[in-house]
Amino acid sequence: MSLEIVPFVVAIPARFSASRLPGKPLRLLGGRPLIHRVAERALSAGAREVWVATDDVRIAEAVASLDGVHVAMTANTHLSGSDRLAECARIAGWDPEMCVVNLQGDEPFAPAAGIRAVAALLHHSNADMATLATTIDKSEDLFNPNIVKLVCNAHGEALYFSRAPIPWNRDTFATTPEPTPLGPWLRHIGLYACNAGFLQRFTTMQPGTLEQIESLEQLRVLEAGHRIAVRITPEHFPPGIDTPEDLARAEKALEDV
């Protein structure tokens, strides 16, 4: 599959009241707000436009100092980041066919090539949404509920996403305390692409039981019968920042560069 550059915009959902790391977008990483570093990754990927969608004036004010980054002030009632981005798309006035890359606000090390790749994957697939995955090679990642796992069908489309270790190896996991994950285990990367029109359709879908149990908004798409294309990327995506421990790890990684 050719993954040449296709036109796309990037939208970054950002909320202040993250339960595991309150004020996350404004937490400092290397002396700068986390949201700054994420937005700059989007700019480096060559997006036509970069928007931060937030309901918090503190985040909006922090982003205002970044050249080339727009802010969409959204409602504080959205159930998910994708719901927030649907409002952002209306504010920005994007064409329904415009490819929108949803870059999570906790991905300060997202490689530019990976951002471009997910846009190209959507362009070349017949799926409603596209995302990326990478292989898991550490047992602590496989069993970490903050690291989302996924399984795919033979056509490279997502079957399910879970915080649990899927697929479950019945013969190994039940008997080995810390098995080495040699096999088909994949870590989901919090990066999505869909067109602006599908974002609006997303808002009409009711959150299903699976989404509510796992607290994973992408399951709403699968539960509604839509398809998500998945590419196993060679690009290195460090895990996102969800907890104070993740932030400390990212700080150390930045110091080691």
UniProtKB/Swiss-Prot annotation:
Q: Where in the cell is it found?
A: Cytoplasm
* GO CC field: cytosol
Q: Name one GO biological process term.
A: lipopolysaccharide biosynthetic process
| Key words of the record | Cytoplasm, Lipopolysaccharide biosynthesis, Nucleotidyltransferase, Transferase
List the Pfam families.
Answer: CTP_transf_3
Q: Catalysed reaction per UniProt?
A: 3-deoxy-alpha-D-manno-oct-2-ulosonate + CTP = CMP-3-deoxy-beta-D-manno-octulosonate + diphosphate
Q: What cystine linkages occur within this chain?
A: none
Major subcellular site: cytoplasm
Family as reported in the entry's similarity comment: Belongs to the KdsB family.
Identification of the protein by name: 3-deoxy-manno-octulosonate cytidylyltransferase
